[in-house]
Amino acid sequence: MEKMKVTKTSILGSDSKGVICPTLRRVKQLLRGTNMKRNTTILYFLLLIGIISGCTEKERRNSLRPLSEGSFDKEYQQHWIITDDSVKPFEVVREDKCIQVELPSKLPYSDLDTIFSSYKLIPLETSEEFLIGNIDRIIKCPGCYCIQDRENANVFIFEENGKFRCKLGNKGHARNEHLDAWSIAYDEKNEQIVMLDLTGRRLLSYDLMGNLKKVASLFFLYHDMAILGDDILCLTGSAYNRFSDIIDLSRLVLADKMGKPIRRGFPITEMIRNRFTYGDKMTQYKDKAYFTDLIADTVWEVSGKEMAPILNMTVNGSQRFSKDEKENMTDHIFEMRHAKQPHTIQIHISSEYIALPVAIPRAGSLIALMLISRKSNRQKFVGISTNHTRLDSYLPTTGPDGFADDSTLIYTIQPNTILLGASNTPIKDHLSKEERELLKNLKPDDNPVLLLERLIDF
């Protein structure tokens, strides 16, 4: 019996001999060509994605991005703030116009009546809804006072007579809330208070009635700021406590309104470990900012992309730290010199005066007051009496905390401080009957009191 022939059939079809017919062969060739083109297209597409991803990653590494709540990217911080040469340093100008100030080593006695022409007491309204734990910064705004209480993450606005006006925002994780109130600054151009929420990585802008106007993400970390027109002057570097992971360098950075750095750095010696080379706070007046360099004992003015030394302090005719000490600064050298010689870490400024609280270590670390007229460069050093029943025995030790106007200093005083010597202090001689009665009725846990002292022109 003849065996049956088995013919293998291609999926494309075949004749009885298993040979693909010309038509089917052509179809297969076309499909193979199509597959090759398709594979080539896919290959090019994947290659293009790889190139785009590489460029995007490179761009990502060299560009700013918003920081998420509680996040910290050390690489980005170092790249933009420390090492990026595309961000130019500040231009230092007017180095030859620096005022020279000699800080006395001994504490002179000065009758405050020869310095101040009038006094005014403004008790801040007290309520459980707006209790102030501590005043970290007070800003005199048109018609009101803005007060920062960092410890309790609160910012309050009080009327000029001390009546409560409003609280800025609420604590929380929502976009329109804040986790802390690390710093505040006044945006004079837009008449708004800007709050730095460092934990939440954002800036919140409020009008003077407490209405939220804008929320912006941070692109890098900083702990103090000043609003200079459309730009923000930021003080970056190590902060305190839970923010100790921030890079251990202190830098000034000028950022535009979008948060991008446009000026950076500061041409002085590097900071000593675990401490800023700068004073505790920057001070803002109009569209300029001021800060103190603690190693060079110099007060600087920053205006736009320029900065200038405006005041240099000496002790016994020379700077506290020699050139060699500045270049090889240590905590021990810094602390020892601070413990033995007078120094200042803050500055308050108006169009008329510069006020510098001065610590006198050999006088029990009491704070005296150096006053400088910006018109005449004349200087007055206000000492503190050792008579603790007098007005001038304890008021200067509290500050001052700023200027209420061009010639009036603001002191913030806790009620229990006033009550300690209220029965004997001559503060009553300078207050109205109503103010004296109010002083008498203060309670230790009441909100702080503002004391306005008007300077006598010199």
Where are the model-predicted features located?
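Blade-loop segments of beta-propeller domains
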Residues: 124-135, 152-154, 163-190
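Repeated scaffold domains used in trafficking and secretory/extracellular systems
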Residues: 134-137, 179-184, 220-227, 273-281, ...
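Asp-box/WD-like beta-propeller blade repeats and closely related beta-sheet repeat scaffolds
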Residues: 180, 197-243, 248, 265-270
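Short beta-strand elements that form the blades of beta-propeller/WD-repeat-like
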Residues: 144-149, 191-197, 231-243, 284-300, ...
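Conserved blade-ending motifs and adjacent loop-strand segments that build the rim/top face
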Residues: 310-331, 375-405
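Blade/loop signatures of beta-propeller domains
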Residues: 69-121
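C-terminal motif of bacterial Sec signal peptides marking the signal peptidase cleavage site
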Residues: 52-54
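Short coil/turn segments at the loop-to-beta-strand junctions that recur within blades
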Residues: 128, 169-176, 217-223, 268-272, ...
